[in-house]
Amino acid sequence: MKHAALTLAVFLSLAACAPKAPDGPPRPNAAGLVPLPCGLGSLRPFSTGYCIFNRNFVTPQARDVAVQAAAAVAKQYPGLVVHYMDASGPDGHRPFAPHLSHGDGREIDLALFYTGADGHPMFKPPGLTGYRNYEPPRPGDPVMCAGQSGGARDPDPPVSRHWRLDEARTKALVEAVTRDPRVKRVFLEPHLKLRLGLRADGKIHFQGCRAARHDDHLHVDVL
């Protein structure tokens, strides 16, 4: 027990002491990557585990994109926090398990926004990881991978689930990300693109049926 506590303390110390330029963002490591913020700003990890286990490394440009998008949405919705999940490891190797991509520091998973069943906004998605809070197609919505499930295509959640997509805040996040010229593309399920009324600007893509569902998070790919 003491050993586990000591190990956790060391991880926390390392995460807190990433080298920084004077009055600026962290300095890139040997792979040219920097950690995403782990503090209390408008961009935060969904769980401290993403920082402790070094799953939050990105290029300096990708960091700027995420920080600025979060700030833009927080300006529109004061007090809002954008939560990130997996980005890349510090070594820059692809692919970054369990993903089919990630790893080079140019890709970040951002959580969508939710309300409770009562309609009140949730501060962060339910669950332990930020993933798998799926918002399934409604009747009449496009269904891209009908009949496919398993590791890549998990089944829909029950109708009785205690969360629902917060469409206004999620749309604001997608628009803040896609309007940045440094963003190459984002992955989002077609039924959410249609439901949110997102314009076809060439950046919002369907990831295919081999990859994980993207109606629980936004995958951002930076140039």
Per-region residue spans from a language model:
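Hydrophobic helical h-region of N-terminal Sec-dependent signal peptides
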Residues: L6-L14
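Active-site acidic/histidine clusters and adjacent loop/turn architecture
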Residues: P22-Y84, D166-V183
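Envelope-exposed proteins and targeting segments
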Residues: P78-L80, D104-I108, R182, H214-L218
